[in-house]
UniProtKB/Swiss-Prot annotation:
This is ATP phosphoribosyltransferase. Feedback inhibited by histidine. Its main location: cytoplasm. The gene is hisG. Its EC number is 2.4.2.17. Pathway: Amino-acid biosynthesis; L-histidine biosynthesis; L-histidine from 5-phospho-alpha-D-ribose 1-diphosphate: step 1/9. GO terms for biological process: L-histidine biosynthetic process. Belongs to the ATP phosphoribosyltransferase family. Long subfamily. It comes from Rhodococcus opacus (strain B4).
Length: 283
């Protein structure tokens, strides 16, 4: 039976549960449940702290896990990404009090508070910068005000929390993070149970990022229309009652699809319809 780790709480939890449910797997009905058995799919889900998931998967005790890329890298566990999931996107950056034009080199000799000490140490080491890294489990923004640290390194979403504490982010991103599906590094590629879950989830992720576009197109503009909607492999063309027209169906990315519809309409296409995709096996 496949053993899969899922975040038990936090920003990744609900999105992970939703994507697995859409992929046909059983959801837990009580947030206090630590395990859920899905006998019809031969999977057992374990609900764990997001920061611990890479450790369990890297040890080989669990086959797959959903966690954040930043958490997986900071863990130091021997894991590999199988799939980017497209949710929980954030950046991991240095920040310090506003009012100075900070550069990463300015961190030399300072105290840096973070919940991701390994990520920070690795980055500082790569830059040849010596600084003191202070590990905190959360709310690192307040550490400067309390005199514990001179700067921080933390996940940055909208930046609102930094502004509330009069902090400014600087330097390159240490890690562009999002939810990822991980496995132990070096896992066999021919594990059918593991691969089935990966492909199901991949189909949901693809469906969330694409939609199906249908439209009627005069044959006189068909070549130009197909340049706008080339589809995944090739669009589907179907004859219409009027032999001068064809029906076209093609997948297009959700991002920017309204612009695609505008282009088709300006070109002369009619009855342009966008439909959501629930799931697919497209890749």
């Amino acid at each position: 039976m496949l053993r899969v780790a899922v975040p038990n709480k936090g920003s990744l939890s609900e999105s992970a549960a939703e994507i697995l449910s859409e992929a046909g797997y059983r959801r837990r009905t009580d947030s206090r449940d630590l395990t859920v058995l899905d006998p019809s799919n031969q999977v057992e889900f374990f609900f764990l702290r997001p920061k611990d998931i890479a450790i369990y998967v890297g040890s080989g005790e669990l086959d797959l896990g959903i966690t954040g890329r930043d958490l997986a890298r900071d863990s130091g566990a021997p894991v590999a990404e199988r799939l980017s999931l497209g949710f929980g996107r954030s950046t991991f950056r240095y920040a310090a009090p506003a009012g100075k034009d900070w550069k990463v080199e300015d961190l030399a000799g300072l105290r840096i508070a973070t919940s991701y000490p390994n990520l920070v140490r690795d980055d500082l080491s790569a830059r040849g910068i010596e600084a003191s890294v202070i590990r905190l489990d959360g709310a690192v923004e307040i550490s400067i005000q309390l005199g514990v640290a001179d700067a921080i390194a933390d996940v940055v979403g909208s930046g609102r929390t930094l502004r509330q504490h009069n902090l400014v982010a600087f330097g390159d991103t240490l890690c562009d993070s999002e939810g990822v599906l991980i496995e132990r590094a070096g896992s066999p590629a021919d594990d059918s149970a593991r691969n089935q879950l990966v492909e199901r989830v991949r189909g949901i992720v693809f469906a969330q990022q694409n939609l199906m576009l249908d439209y009627d197109c005069p044959k006189t503009i068909l070549d130009d229309a197909l340049k706008i909607t080339p589809g995944l492999e090739s669009p589907t063309l179907s004859p219409l009652a009027d032999e001068n027209w064809v029906a076209v169906r093609a997948m297009v990315p959700i991002k920017g699809h309204n612009g695609v519809m505008d282009e088709l309409a300006d070109l002369g296409a009619k009855a342009i319809l966008a439909s959501n995709i629930r799931s697919c096996r497209a890749l």
